[in-house]
Amino acid sequence: MSGAHHLTPPTDYGKPVLAASIGISLALLVYTATRSTLPHVGDNLHALPHGGRYVDGTKSISYFSPSASKTRDPFPFAFLLILTLSGLILLLSRRRSNPHSCPSCGTPHA
């Protein structure tokens, strides 16, 4: 052997992965919260997304808004699902009393 070999710990990618996952999650949340799912009604100059009536000399548009009973906002359900899963992960991660114990048998090894 020509010299002493030094052991180096592997690169920790935890913080960049956490930052990327938070960024992607926020982007998806903003996209789903701000997109319009209402049907497009009208032409390129006259849009009636919330209902209404437009009468011109050559055309007439009558559209009544979608009823609130038919459309449901998925945002509260998604928020509740994320909150429940986060609480479950937190509960299960704190449930282990000794983080240095063996996951197979539960006893600490040297």
UniProtKB/Swiss-Prot annotation:
The chain crosses the membrane at residues 11-34, 77-92. GO terms for cellular component: host cell endoplasmic reticulum membrane; membrane. Residues 35-76 are lumenal. It holds the Pfam family Plant_vir_prot. One of its GO terms (biological process) is transport of virus in host, cell to cell. It is found in: Host endoplasmic reticulum membrane. It comes from the Viruses. Its main location: host cell. InterPro entries: Plant_vir_prot. Residues 1-10, 93-110 are cytoplasmic. The keyword Transport applies. Keywords: Host endoplasmic reticulum, Host membrane, Membrane, Transmembrane, Transmembrane helix, Transport, Viral movement protein. TGBp1, TGBp2 and TGBp3 seem to act together for cell-to-cell propagation. TGBp1 is the main movement protein that physically cross the plasmodesma with the viral genome. TGBp2 and TGBp3 would facilitate TGBp1 function. Plays a role in viral cell-to-cell propagation, by facilitating genome transport to neighboring plant cells through plasmosdesmata,. Belongs to the Tymovirales TGBp2 protein family. This is Movement protein TGB2. It comes from Plantago asiatica mosaic potexvirus.
